[in-house]
Amino acid sequence: MIKHSLSDCLADPDHLIRIKSYVEANVRFLGLSLVTLLVTIQMFRALGSPLRLNKPLVGRRSILEPRWLVGLRFTKGGRELLRQAYKKYKDEIFKVQCNDTEICVLPHRYVEELRGLPASKVSSPQALYNKGLGSYTGLEVIVESHLHFQAIQGHLTPNLASALGIVLDELQDALKTVLPDCSDEWVPFDVHTVLSELVSRLSSRVFGGLELARNQQWIQLSTAYPRNAFACTMALRMVPRIIRPLLAAVLPTYWRTRSNIRDAKRIVGGIITKRRADEGATDMSAKEHPCDLLQWMMNAAAGTETHADDLAHRLLFISDASVMTTSLLISHCLYDLVAHPEALSCIREEVHNVLREGDNFQKTTLHKMRSLDSALKESQRLNPPFLMTFDRVVREPLLLSDGTQIPVGTHLAMPTDAMLQDSSLLPQGGVAPDQFDPFRYARAREDPENAQRFQLATTEAKSLVFGHGKHACPGRFFASSEAKIILSHLLLLYDFRYPEGKGRPESWLFSENVAIDPNARLLIKKRNDAASNLAMLAKAL
């Protein structure tokens, strides 16, 4: 049959032409049908569902362009896209597509209106959970209750003076073991890795006591967990939701993240068990009773919060936030100051003069270090950890004061990085917004009306790195004080410079995140006057 048909075709050229025309027509029809289907799908997506806010989506080159491609472009160039969008829509609402999430970006005039809304209307923890893919990275505890938030706000901040004393005590030992030996020569200094371990040591002492701070496995996992969780989140957000369980099953960082959480529960769980066994002891002096964040959470916990696994999980989350943000803050500032040696010398002199007056390292002493505070805030301005902050997820239909209706499920945020480049929102005077001016905020505070403004830990509608309102970062006062203590010690005890031919490293940008270049290095050498400065620092304990 086949041979016969083939011979017929060869004998009749017109028959071949008819077959060829038939195939071409069907291919064209199938191609046209496929294109029509894709166009229809994209048009429906572009028009959006009734629950999608009808505002301009920046970064989209065509209404036919798929959202995943827009999100991919944001992953690589989010900072520039947000800054350009801010210039165009500064006083308007616009949207950006971040991988899997459409974010509604609001002008800062809405901050005061939104900050007071109840959690039943807008949720900050839910926004963090969604962005961090909490079901994969273990963020369930932050939406189940606010025990950790309340413990920091109600106990750590009011007891900041005693917490700083603990930080200083732990720092004396940590400097000997964490920093490289550089007494006689310049040696390479892995800034972010070393500072992450240093911050983990100091914070862990305040969060869970001496036993936790000296547990090397805890220190390792408290610095590894943020890296693994971040890498896991970024990988999973690149693929559709339906594929995520399959990808997670073969993703090494997912399994490392879960392993970090299990190890944290084992380590902290052991401490909790021992403390509960000691609670009934009558021979313990008041001095022996634990006084740290873990104990404050244990005392206030109720229901499922009392479970050791729950408490340990919360402590790991707090450590994650502390280590990541504080080490980034100090690293960026150190890089900036080493690139501006005159400013570094001025700040070193300020720290020296304040401590030479005989003041102890307390909150009032740190307040006197205005140039150091200003340099940290300026460095943070140029390299905030996130391009957008003040994140909220709308839980109930929201009607803003100007009549704007926000649908349920909308993810709201503020363009923090772009706002920090807006000269109209910065203190008057100083160099251009894109330049590092270490004394920008110190000069502004010379005006008596601004004496309590423009500090690293203060928040306002124009400065949202730590958020603003009742959901602002509760640990910012501890973090800013810890950063100043660490940096002041480093400046008094060590000299720093860039390797030959190197300069201030560019930050790594990935989606909404601003990170340190992990390959960047400084050179470090102990100062000639380190011994006398160390003695002065010891008197300030």
Curated annotation (Swiss-Prot):
Which InterPro entries does this UniProt record tie to the protein?
Cyt_P450 (IPR001128), Cyt_P450_CS (IPR017972), Cyt_P450_E_grp-IV (IPR002403), Cyt_P450_sf (IPR036396)
Could you say which cofactors this protein requires? Answer: heme
Q: Which UniProt keywords apply?
A: Heme, Iron, Metal-binding, Monooxygenase, Oxidoreductase
Q: Which residues bind heme?
A: C473
Query: Which Pfam families does this one have?
Result: p450
**Taxonomy, superkingdom:** Eukaryota
Q: In which pathway does it act?
A: Mycotoxin biosynthesis
Write down the top EC class of this protein: oxidoreductase
Which positions carry the signal peptide feature in this UniProt record?
none
One GO BP annotation of this record: secondary metabolic process
For molecular function, the Gene Ontology terms on record are:
heme binding; iron ion binding; monooxygenase activity; oxidoreductase activity, acting on paired donors, with incorporation or reduction of molecular oxygen
| EC number(s) from the headed UniProt entry | 1.-.-.-
**Family the entry assigns:** Belongs to the cytochrome P450 family.
Purpose of the protein: Geranylgeranyl pyrophosphate synthase; part of the gene cluster that mediates the biosynthesis of aphidicolin, a specific inhibitor of eukaryotic DNA synthesis and DNA polymerase alpha. The geranylgeranyl pyrophosphate synthase GGS is required for supplying a sufficient amount of geranylgeranyl diphosphate (GGDP), the general precursor of diterpenes. The diterpene synthase ACS then catalyzes the conversion of geranylgeranyl diphosphate to aphidicolan-16-beta-ol via the intermediate syn-copalyldiphosphate (syn-CDP).
Q: What is this protein called?
A: Cytochrome P450 monooxygenase 2
The species is Neocamarosporium betae
